Amino acid sequence: MTQPDFTRVPAVEGYTGAQSYRAGDVVTVRCASRAPLFDARITRVGAERIEVHTVEGVRGHDQPVPDRAWEAGCGWEDTFAFTVGNDWPSGFYEIELRARGEAEADWRGAGHAFFTVLGRRPDPERPLLLLSTNTYQAYNQWGGRCMYTGATEVSFDRPLERGYLRRPAAPFDTEYDGRLADTTGNDRDHDRLVEYQRHHSYPLWTSSSGWHNWERRFVRWAEAAGFGIDVATNDDLHDGPDVLAGRRLVLSVGHDEYWSWDMRDHIDRFVDDGGRW
């Protein structure tokens, strides 16, 4: 008997053409849809969830998953696009892709993608949070493998597996939305984690990495406490030191395991020049 693949969403899945954008940029979204129509809802996630845009009635079409997609990527065509608003603040943005007619509570009917918005100009009073997007992909088993199940190289050109970006509170414990990462038997929350994952059929590695586990909690706390936070990705740091220009403080929160040499060089230079990391 073939076991279901709980890393995937049956109705609609997708990912963006890039991980970060600025005001006025066009965000492209590449989807595989088994539903004839779906809607996209774009929400900034911080202390509050604020919906900023919707794209309704997107015509769905399926796109093939290549062999070794975890390594080679999907290579999907763009399905729809939208423009980042001039008034959208820096932050993490979730894209919900929900098939028409699917109930809100049914995970099979909606996939999720993400992107970040970079600020127009750096504000030295606002810390810059670098999302650990390299680590997201290292643990992302979508397409068959991750770095912990046999892959030696992984692609960013694919969706994130179900549960990385958004997970509901468990109905048996409304105050619990998933343990951070410790899955040892000695951890007092381990049993709750196992029950939570079993109840929602979440893949194992969603407890080890991902926005939902780590940065989401920090941003929610920081913004609620009155701290302004700008957001960027590992890619932004890898591409050059410009993302650090004008900053006093750069933050890494949670499970930030995978770095490139360029990332480290840029941070070292930032610290040598008086920045705080």
Residue positions per predicted region:
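Extracytoplasmic entry segments of secretory-pathway proteins
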Residues: 1, 72, 127-128
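Proline/serine/threonine-rich low-complexity linkers at boundaries of modular beta-sandwich domains
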Residues: 1-11
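Ligand-binding face of N-terminal immunoglobulin V-set domains in extracellular IgSF glycoproteins
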Residues: 13-48, 53-102, 107-117
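Aromatic-Pro/Gly-enriched surface loop or interdomain linker
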Residues: 33-49, 53-58, 107-243
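Helical hinge/lid and interdomain linker segments adjacent to catalytic or ligand-binding clefts
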Residues: 60, 64-74, 79-83, 87-89, ...
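Flexible loop residues that form catalytic
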Residues: 98, 132, 255
